[in-house]
């Protein structure tokens, strides 16, 4: 074992005193308390000394108590005036009492029998009593004086003078905790001391002067302990979930996807439902499954030719379909709502025009009524995308989804389940296995129906998906509660591992 100068000095001091407090060691060695404690912890780790800690409850003055120790308690100051005047109106005490003290002084003087209180046409009159005239030193005065002199007093000692609750009730003092530390040398420490310890000051820094003069040969250079525990540093870093989103965005762009962007969180029902061939009487459009805007209530529809094609698809059908067979309402389509799924952006992009073949994606905030728990939020992020091309099939879609789950989320097991969406056929649900939560649904996907794509001006197959990217992040970041992604928990934010 290698001991430094401070450790040797502290060990020799403890050996001389056999048992000592930290304060005694500081006084004996003339080292500061931090250096002494550091040396004590090192010596204890080596088994050369034993450190004993005893916790004790203490009472210390508050800022108010410190003020009272200098200028006197409110009742003492009030009595000085009353002894001089015998009686005084409450307002006459304003020179010696603060506003908050004036409100309390009447009760204190009356409760302790120090003054009689009555009211006349001018206000409250305080008249000193015989007890007030002869008042001597009370327990509270003795306690205040003792605390002022010592700084801190044990609860046991102060309790012999006054009930601690009385001091705390008047906010004169508060309870704290003091740790008394004593150390004693062990047999191992005694053996080391008996062998002889050379106390030689160490040099912690090899300077150019020491090298040039050759004195480095004469001094003892303190070795660096690279295994010594140090204070953990928490450098600034990006929020873990933001890093995850940025990585996914970058990877998709590297794979040739084009990002779809939008400035607003609000959509008309036209883009959120109607353009996706979802009928206006569908239960998913009701308040139980979506949010609606109270004001403004309605937005604007796009150009008439697009609206008429969507109307035709709903009422009579397109691409050989019979449609939904009802009278489509433009008024219903104009209703505004927070976006319920990012697929609304896919519909906008298809109507705007796309490259064929082409790959598109977006990461957007969406809103749906739900019960908050560790896998569900009412406001969450969704990654939505589609691929358009002449020869695309459902199997291409399954391959993309599996790649998402395994490569991006880090899932080990993936399952596909048949599903239903009004705007895709066939449709599929993607689920992955989480070690803590079991099978977790990631999202839905399918081949856009021709009634939808033809109304939007697209003549080739389009495979599409909408995945809860928050759940992908749960897998990648190794968490079992989706709410942590948006948490202010400093411990998690500091300790979350960097990904990729």
Swiss-Prot record:
Keywords: Aminoacyl-tRNA synthetase, ATP-binding, Cytoplasm, Ligase, Magnesium, Metal-binding, Nucleotide-binding, Protein biosynthesis. InterPro entries: aa-tRNA-synth_II, aa-tRNA-synth_II/BPL/LPL, Phe-tRNA-synth_IIc_asu, Phe_tRNA_ligase_alpha_bac/arc, Phenylalanyl-tRNA_Synthase, WH-like_DNA-bd_sf, WH_DNA-bd_sf. It catalyses: tRNA(Phe) + L-phenylalanine + ATP = L-phenylalanyl-tRNA(Phe) + AMP + diphosphate + H(+). One of its GO terms (cellular component) is cytoplasm. L-phenylalanine binds at residues 343, 382-384, 423, 448. Mg(2+) binds at residue 425. GO terms for molecular function: ATP binding; magnesium ion binding; phenylalanine-tRNA ligase activity; tRNA binding. Signal peptide: none annotated. One of its GO terms (biological process) is phenylalanyl-tRNA aminoacylation. Binds 2 magnesium ions per tetramer. Its main location: cytoplasm. This is Phenylalanine--tRNA ligase alpha subunit. It comes from Pyrococcus abyssi (strain GE5 / Orsay). The lineage of its organism: Archaea, Methanobacteriati, Methanobacteriota, Thermococci, Thermococcales. The gene is pheS.
